[in-house]
Amino acid sequence: MTKTLHFDCLSGISGDMTLGALIDLGVSVDQIQQGLHSLNLPDLKLRTEEVKKCGFRAVQIHIDHPPEKAHRHLHHIDAMIDEATEINDSAKALAKKIFLCVGEAEAKVHGCSLRKVHFHEVGAIDSIADIVGVAIAIDALDVQHATSSTIPTGTGAITIDHGRVAVPAPATAEILTGVPLMACDIESELTTPTGAAIIKTLARSFGPPPAMTPLRVGYGSGTRDLEGQANVLRVTLGELTEASSSQGQIETDRVTLLESNIDDATAEQLANVSELLMSAGALDVWQTPIVMKKGRLATTVSVLCDASRIGALQTLLFTQTSTIGLRRTEMNRSKLARESQTVETPDGPAKGKTVRLPDGTLRFSLENDEVKRLCAATGKSADQIRTEAQAAFAAG
């Protein structure tokens, strides 16, 4: 049976809450400690404490280490992980993937290259311990699947190295693009950049738990006390049922459909608006010809987006078209698990996309821009380029 984890993030998610919950599921503290020491952090000590939040027990994590002022770059952290002798390759890969998620967000919000990004809070020893510790724990649990509830960010303002900012912090907001958010009016930072990166990297879908048989439940505690609810993260370890396993590669999320009927725009104007909408973060944009009242020909402009982009996209539609009203529909979406992949063709590396079908088989498709690029460079037909790319993918 396929083992899975489901994260219930009613009070948000952070690195220490995640690590505490995974340890509460039964992962050995000594195993995590041994792996952390091999990061060339011999003075680091991981301690656990059983606490109560609103009357419920949970595991709270403490990271003890000498004070430091170092601001590390991503390549420094990657090197630390690569050189760790007591961490499995799969745990190393997961930890580096989580750090990359944070690094890409930091690069975007600060307007610099990934290599020049230097980590502040996330580069501190306790955050390194949280992320690497979580990766070690996930590897120890041997889970192949994870899902999560929608994510609350909290509200209000916090002070970081760059000054006072609104919640969620800029990096957190960037990481959570495309992730369904939970409505929340608690004035506190519930989800940190570390927690956001962990859940975005791990979770295949956001919403209710899948059909599964629960095996164990772990609770990780946050440091603050919240009014009216326990500041804990609940993580359930279970086995997917047969029906759920057969759909294990199908992800689900919530998206919003914005639509407007426009009868006084040219084809060029609508094409330009579509490009602007995609650049502003729409998941997809399409146009449908319709006949309106009085027999007028018109076009329905449809925009698919996640909740975080609704405001920006509807503002763009109101300012860039003549529409005076929009329809908004919330809907569930199912999609195959996918990831970017580069294959080595006879004409050099080419970027494509791999999706995993419900029966577990993989399907590869070359990006159309890559097809055009290779056709222009080689004079080959598009069919030949695609055939060679498929052969390269099949050869591994």
From Swiss-Prot:
The keyword Cell cycle does not apply. It comes from the Bacteria. Disulfide bonds: none annotated. The keyword Metal-binding does not apply. Residues 333-355 are annotated as: Disordered. Belongs to the LarC family. This is Putative nickel insertion protein. It comes from Rhodopirellula baltica (strain DSM 10527 / NCIMB 13988 / SH1).
